Amino acid sequence: MPDWDKIFKEKGYVFVDPHPDISRLASLFHTHGVRRILDLGCGTGRHLAFLTQEGFEVSGFDSSSTALELAMKWLQEEELSADVHLGRMEEPFPYPDGFFDAVVSIQVIHHNMMNNILATIREIERVLKIGGYIFITVPFFGPKPEKLEDDWNLYQVEEGTFIPQSGPESGIPHHYFTEEELVEVFRNFKILEMHTDDTNHQCVLAVREY
């Protein structure tokens, strides 16, 4: 299995600044009475810290114990607190049905095979209340041709899914969504907006309808 602990031990705080949309989302969440937020794939805590500072009750969930240790250190240094859990996103989340008002997941859920991505989305739906928000970012449209032969040496394992054979994320699946695919996998949500961010990821803001 991919070794996220190894990546975080080598690179430490891989991301520090929050995603550009998070500040705007925090305002939206406050306006609509969002209180509990799940940061799925929270990594070293950049959104845990920001959203906690904004006054939300935030839970972080990640598969890397090293990342969670760094996240807790960050929170302690900022004199903040958040609930964190270690686990794999394709397995049942440690939260009851309808527990969260919102789920954010930045550059995370695409790191899997499609059957596991669908399992993750089912769990997101389960722990999110009806009327709750999701904000998800994923790569889309497929890798550029040069990515197939550069230092990543991508190998296609199923439709839309590639695994780097070398480089820092060697062995980690990367699923590239199409817009139609995103609409289908989030069919139980009303999509409010879709746009491309400055890292060339597709951002999906949606509300759970069913």
What spans do the regions from the language model cover?
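A short beta-strand submotif of the Rossmann-like class I SAM-dependent methyltransferase core
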Residues: 105-108
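A short glycine-rich, Lys/Arg-flanked "PGG" loop and its adjoining helix->strand segment in the class I
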Residues: 118-130
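Conserved catalytic-core motifs of eukaryotic protein kinase domains, centered on the activation segment
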Residues: 114-116
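Class I SAM-dependent methyltransferase core
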Residues: 39
